[in-house]
């Protein structure tokens, strides 16, 4: 009888444990270098950075700018302006929606008073429904932030 009781208790203990499985994992994005025909580059932010998500995207854009936006010219300046970052999230029971809109302006100034301006925007959103962990929400946010910058990266690479 005692062995049956131990077996039942072990079975209940194992069966009642909540799964720790994450539904959304961090994605890995690869960025190629983008080369501009300028001598210098500068990053300017026209948005107010307050929330942790805004801090994350600001730092991510700075790293992307420093590591993947390259200059290889003899004259001119590249000014990259973060023009807009809008984020919204809706949290309800068993439902989470996150959206992000980003606009970045690329201004290429030359000495002969010619300039080119590219205004590039990206919008992303994601939804989680059902049983999910807070880590899933954070992973969704980070993935969407990086995906929006990847879209901007691809659009500007095609434009120049």
Predicted regions and their residues:
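N-terminal secretory signal peptides that target proteins for export/translocation
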Residues: 1-2
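Sec-dependent N-terminal signal peptides
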Residues: 5-14
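Alpha-helix initiation/capping motif
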Residues: 26-27, 54, 133
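Bacterial Sec signal peptide processing site at the extreme N-terminus
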Residues: 16-32
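Hydrophobic alpha-helical membrane-association signature
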Residues: 61, 98-100, 144, 148
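C-terminal/domain-edge helix-coil "capping" segments
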Residues: 131-160
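Surface-exposed short loop/turn segments
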Residues: 73-135
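N-terminal segment of the mature soluble domain
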Residues: 32-84
């Amino acid at each position: 009888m005692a062995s049956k009781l131990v077996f039942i208790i072990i079975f209940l203990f194992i069966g009642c444990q909540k799964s720790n499985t994450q539904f959304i994992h961090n994605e890995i994005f690869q960025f190629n270098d983008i080369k501009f025909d300028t001598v210098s580059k500068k990053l300017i932010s026209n948005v107010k950075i307050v929330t942790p998500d805004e801090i994350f995207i600001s730092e991510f854009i700075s790293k992307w700018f420093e590591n993947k936006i390259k200059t290889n010219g003899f004259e001119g300046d590249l000014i990259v302006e973060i023009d807009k970052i809008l984020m919204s999230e809706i949290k309800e029971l068993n439902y989470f929606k996150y959206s992000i809109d980003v606009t970045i302006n690329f201004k290429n100034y030359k000495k002969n008073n010619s300039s080119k301006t590219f205004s590039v925007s990206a919008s992303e959103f994601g939804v989680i429904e059902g049983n999910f962990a807070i880590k899933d929400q954070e992973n969704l946010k980070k993935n969407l932030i990086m995906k929006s910058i990847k879209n901007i990266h691809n659009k500007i690479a095609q434009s120049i």
